[in-house]
Amino acid sequence: MSLHIATMSSPSQELLLKPTFNPLYAASKPLLTHTTKNHVSLSRTTTTRAILSSTKEVVMKEFRHHRALKIISGLHNFDKENVASVVTAADKGGATHVDIACDPELVKLVVSLTSLPICVSSVDPSAFLAAVEAGATMVEIGNYDSFYDSGRLFSPDEILLLTKETRRFLPNVTLSVTVPHTLSLPEQAKLAELLQEEGADIIQTEGGKCSNPSKAGVLGLLEKATPTLAAAYTISRAVKIPVMCASGLSAVTVPLAITAGAAGVGVGSAVNKLNDVVAMIAQVRSLADALASQKETNVDQEKTVKWL
């Protein structure tokens, strides 16, 4: 399958958008070798369990190493050209995961472009089913910020209900749940604990409108990231599952998120608001390099402690 994007007239950019084989998607279509009805049923069940287990391990691997980098195209972004550019940038720039709107056609497009684990975001649990069938390997209840301008807020009880419903529909798929910044830090920590009990695999933080900086430059970048860094610090000490720090992060503040206790970071507007795929790749690369440098720093510190 090939993809042509009309706005990408540069030969180098068209080459960057070349389809990629996705081994996870190929594995989701098991070969049935038995002929009897019972054997076929057993084969499907066994194969499905094995695939889900191995897929979840792939999705969670970078979180366990505290180096997950998820690039987010946006909950309400159904622009195939923009999503393709963002995903290509994530793939070529060194990200470990991509996060797109929960739409089966978008998922099929992204499956053709990258072998990275694909996360779909929604606040409608029933919408996840078709997306997972299309090739998504991770689902997320979150990206509430797109609703805030209209005054729509999500309560802890509502988020817990959405989590329970999602787990009922998809008991074995990797599940990430965002804790809204509209709650106080103690309330965020409490909700995270309850989400962990309900089977969430990852907790994601957010910064929201309160992260708009009043200063420029590095000071502004630090100010913008403060709410989500504070949430990552607080929540990571309340739960045992990985925490993903998202909202308002940059190459300057990504290392701080890991230091605060996050197992990974999620970045959206710093990438998806750019209008050139090459610029997007450069931005993702700077984020990946910042994460790598933090990992090297942690290793050096561990060696120093052992030497002392």
Each predicted region: which residue ranges?
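Alpha/beta enzyme core
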Residues: 2-33, 38-46, 51-245, 249-308
